Regions:
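N-terminal presequence-like segments and the immediate start of the first folded domain
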Residues: 1-69, 75-123
Length: 123
């Protein structure tokens, strides 16, 4: 099965040893994506920035939002759940992937959200 690594712009990628996304066959895994450079924005705005980065990685892997079957949202503050959830719903409200939202300490203390995504591209 063919493997394609999709590089992002994070300086952490070579240090930690990860790719923004990896496509194996028709499955695309997008790494945890944070709002780098958007730390001062609201939780909803950070979520929109993150989803834009995820969309770019999906496109580079030959996928679209419509192919996403699962997302995982890691949020820094429980009180942000609805704001983040609504921004997630702006993209996925009709698509309705399986989703998880967990409160967690994030790598950057100013990040309010980090999101992972998995997509399956139709043959």
């Amino acid at each position: 099965m063919k493997r394609t690594n999709i590089a992002g712009t994070s300086p952490c990628e070579p240090v930690i040893g990860f790719s923004r996304a990896v496509r194996i066959g028709n499955v695309v895994h997008v790494s945890g994506t944070g709002p780098a450079g958007a730390e001062e924005l609201s939780a909803a705005e950070q979520t929109r920035v993150v989803l834009g980065l995820i969309e770019k990685a999906l496109r580079q892997a030959g996928a679209r939002f419509e192919d996403v079957v699962r997302t995982r949202m890691f949020i820094a503050h429980a009180e942000d759940w609805e704001e983040i959830g609504r921004a997630h719903g702006e993209v996925f409200g009709v698509i309705r992937p399986a989703a998880t939202m967990v409160v967690a300490a994030l790598l950057n203390a100013k990040w309010r959200v980090e999101i992972e995504a998995e997509a399956v591209v139709a043959d």
